[in-house]
Amino acid sequence: MQEKHGKAACDFVPDTYILPDEFGEFYEHYQKLKQYDSKKNVWIVKPANAAQGRGIMLIDDVNDVNVDETSVISRYVTNPLLINGHKFDLRVYVLVTSYEPLRVYIFQEGLARFASETYTSKIDKNNKYMHLTNYSINKKNAKFVQNANCEQDDVGYKWSLGAFCRHLEQVGIDMDLLWSRSYDVILKTMLTGEPYIQNAMRKNGTHRTNCFEILGFDILIDSDLKPWLLEVNLSPSLACDSPLDMMIKSTLVCDALNIAGVRRFDRKKESLNKIKHRMKGLYNKSKKSTAGGLVGLPGSEIFAG
């Protein structure tokens, strides 16, 4: 993204490298940071094609990097905005219904996901519950609190986006400014990927109206209210482990299907319509035959008189 549009326009993505192919570039960057500020020379490593937080680790020593394994390494954001002393990120859901033209819907509701240990500036590489916000990781912590009532959407370590917004407004944060910045991140990301997906659709012969996609944007807010794009998830999990999950994700799916124009299938009604259509066809065929007209043979453009 930064290679195409420049770092100034896309400075919302932490410095990121694909290993082992870009290890040389990463190593050079690591050494420069080490000279100036070793405390901020912390990186997060994610195995390629992994999900649910599997294999993620923090490193501050280049020797801990496994250069024989395909992975993504990103600079760790060391000044996250905290709520009640905990680090969090936002799962923002985005629906794409067309790429020619690009048509994107950003859902107003989503999730704020919290780390289950109190955050400190001292980096403890082994404490994933403090640094990582992945639900699949934190639910294994004995301190994890699950939301048990969707009407209380600011309880536990997973909130609704609505609860998140209300909390920040109460402490005096300009939510209009924050969302404007977050929407800018989402739209720039979509515009960057647009030509690649258009080309793929043309090669596969996929018609632009035949598909849609729900994306999950993971966004971290730092202490300066700057949104950082951590990753974009294709087909994000729709699993519901709590009433809050069910409320948000069921609404998400219903809205997505309605916007995409997917209609409910009624088997009885559909069968009746097919019978009516077939009977109407037979009636018209019989009517044409008795009138001395031409009758088209089914499945052909050959006519018999």
Which residues does each PLM region occupy?
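Acidic, PEST-like segments
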Residues: M1-K4, D11-H29, T70-V77, L81, ...
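Short, flexible, solvent-exposed loop/turn segments with mixed acidic/basic and small polar residues
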Residues: K4-G6, K46
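Hydrophobic residue at the +6 position relative to the catalytic HRD Asp in the kinase catalytic loop
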Residues: F217-I219
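Glycine-rich phosphate-binding loop of ATP-grasp-fold ATP-dependent ligases
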Residues: D15-Y17, S38-N66, L81, L90-R91
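Substrate-gripping "pore-loop 1 plus following alpha2 helix"
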Residues: Q35-D37, V72
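Short, glycine/acidic-enriched loop or turn micro-motifs at the edges of active sites
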Residues: N49, I221, L234
